[in-house]
């Protein structure tokens, strides 16, 4: 339904133009103009203030390093595109569970091919955007940068078969380690720990290829989605599982062996930073724990510093661990002796 505003040359304002149009009276039109003028005057009344604030916000003094300017119009990495990369990787790694839900034996290769093609395109664009961000747009040959990005994206896609094999061990470990899990299908569909591990393995592979910024964006999307924070720089073996998962933190230089299981709230972190002569934290040094094979760490335990947790060790919940743990050792919290039990009448 539309409104017809009559031309000033038409004397009869009650004239209908069609069955579905209504005439606005001159009095109503005048009221609209008055409202518009009032709103415009309120804006103009503060125009000087807005201009002054805009000048301050755009000044180099205010911006400092909080602004990224592209001289050639190159785009920066986009959150929506990074999410699409994750979705495409999941669809390729777990066809039918993610992405197209009508995959069958006859169209499986077709759907994987379509998703791989789309993945290469989007990933190439985002890798190039990440390189631009890292170079602060100083590159003079953007076409060469795009070619390098396309090559890197192809190298990543070549890593997907091995990544799927490793993820299969993670799914199996998660299923076998949780008596509440009904099937591996349930693990793939539902478990936040596995989703975080998938994102980690994608991000870690990209990081090993030298891709800037994108790996961290992928891991932080998993952090937001699951509450599990795994830095893409961590090294994690096969048959890895995270049960429940909320609050798990794995630092950038952590090394985790095979068949390791973490429960919710576990932190594999650093004790403190070393500082240089200017009192700035020294980055890039190993500062997180090394976890051996077949280790279980229960909920809300913090393992801090570059310490070694031996093979087959079991660490109980709510413990602060800052020293090495030997092979086959079990750490538990001392039994509380200050519990008051009240008898009910």
Go through each PLM region and give its residues.
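Terminal amphipathic alpha-helical/low-complexity segments used for targeting or macromolecular assembly
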Residues: 2-13, 24-217
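Short coil/turn motifs at helix boundaries and re-entrant loops, enriched in small/polar
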Residues: 16
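Structural signal for interior beta-strand "rungs" in well-ordered beta-sheet cores
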Residues: 222-344
